[in-house]
From Swiss-Prot:
Name of the protein described by the UniProt record: NADH-quinone oxidoreductase subunit C
GO cellular component, one term: plasma membrane
EC number: 7.1.1.-
Predominant place of localization: membrane
Subunit structure: NDH-1 is composed of 14 different subunits. Subunits NuoB, C, D, E, F, and G constitute the peripheral sector of the complex.
Cellular compartments annotated: Cell membrane
Gene3D superfamilies from the UniProt entry: NADH:ubiquinone oxidoreductase, 30kDa subunit
Catalytic activity from the UniProt record: a quinone + NADH + 5 H(+)(in) = a quinol + NAD(+) + 4 H(+)(out)
Amino acid sequence: MALDNPTVLARLQAALPDALLGSSEFRGDLSVHVRPERIVDVARFLRDDPELRYHFLENLCGVDYLGREPRFEVVYHLLSFANRHRICLKVGVSERNPSVPSLTELWPGANYHERETFDMFGIVFTGHPCLDRILMPEDWEGHPLRKDVPLGAEEVAFTFNQDRIYAHKPFAKE
């Protein structure tokens, strides 16, 4: 069976009509907006349907749309090797309750992607087996990829600017 976007969308709408919030297509790629509480059902259907067979979770990531509600989005990219077809699932996540169900039961490879998204954005994946920080130190406060994180940082010294940088640094004198 040759898969195309209308076929995939029609199968999803027929099987889980109340789970979908909308869809869009950009440069031939299908994106489907899913209710957060139904992401596991939609992902399981896409994986287990004998005609669709989206057996591979390529990646998932977080996006911060500061000033919009829902503020965050978790984006999942799935691939059907059998049909050579991709689909993108998008789940809006509220700033007040930044949580979405984990997909680690369906794809164990989601483990590190979810931990990274938690670490960088503070989105909690409920049901995750070990949602600890993965990139930042345990005592780090906040989530560095949120757009409201202060950017006050020390300028890095390179060969082109080291004289200017080092002129203001107190160095130990021997």
